[in-house]
Amino acid sequence: MKNYLVNKKNTNEQLKYNKILNVMAIEKVENIEEIYIDFKAEWKKLSLVQRVDLLINSLGKDSRKMLPIEKIIQLVSIIPFVEHSTHISYTSPFSQGKTFQYSKIFPNSKVISSGITEAALFYNKNRGEFGILKNYDIVAFDDVQCLNNDTIASAVYDFLSSGNLSRSNNVVNSISCSSIIFLSNYTEETQKKLENNPYFLKDINLFEPFSDSFQKEAFKSRVIVLPAYLMRDENFIISEEDVYGININVLHKFFQEKLKESLPLFKIELFCKERLKN
């Protein structure tokens, strides 16, 4: 077996997080650099299909149980792991591992499960300190209902379009490339409608879980709406010992390397404007 691969059988003894992580070893790897070099060499040899399946397996889900559309949805949900400033509205039924994915799979992420102030999230004027969005690559709101006032909404709109943490021109280095993930669950009634006809959305508000402050087009047009309602109500968690995924330590290093290569769209726009001036 490749030194960067693990399966359920050889990780059970060290398992400490959650059954979703059965596929990945969580012990520290001392020779991580050597293993990572081997991994990258092997990764180049894999076909697109093999890469997709290996990534999904590495998230703790059995790719063999998933339909092609479900694999695509799963991959889109982890774009923020490798691309800066990718903002996603991820609404789905309960118990699909949404919160776990953003709190454990990516090394520099923060999940917020309660209310938060604008100062704590963006910039504290009194202290002259940046908030959470400056310190983490991914910030996920476990319940979008905690974002329930116009002040927060307005600041979020600005951030989604510009990456700016402060509306003051006097604050230096106030740009952040963090991605924001909005996690929520549909009501039982909406979920049934989506299950009956997931492609007829005329009478369904996909932003139903959000407060009134976030029902404006300025918000809706700036986030990716993940169609997680197309996922079957199945248990995709790996249960067999013949399914292999990437060791979590190697996976973390892989995501971090790809993220460093990423350039946010608003930075590309600023770069183009500067080029035009010159």
Give, region by region, the residue ranges found by the protein language model.
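Extended, charged/polar low-complexity intrinsically disordered regions
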Residues: 1-58
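N-terminal pre-Walker A segment at the start of P-loop NTPase domains
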Residues: 40-84
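Walker A/P-loop
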Residues: 87-117
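AAA+/P-loop NTPase substrate/partner-engagement loops
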Residues: 106-150
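Conserved Walker
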Residues: 128-129, 161-177, 191-194, 207-216
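Conserved AAA+/SF3 P-loop NTPase catalytic/coupling segment centered on the Walker-B
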Residues: 135-160, 175-178, 185-197, 218-219
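A short helix-turn-beta junction within AAA+ P-loop NTPase domains corresponding to the substrate/partner-engaging
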Residues: 193-234
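Conserved AAA+ ATPase small/helical "lid" subdomain
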Residues: 222-278
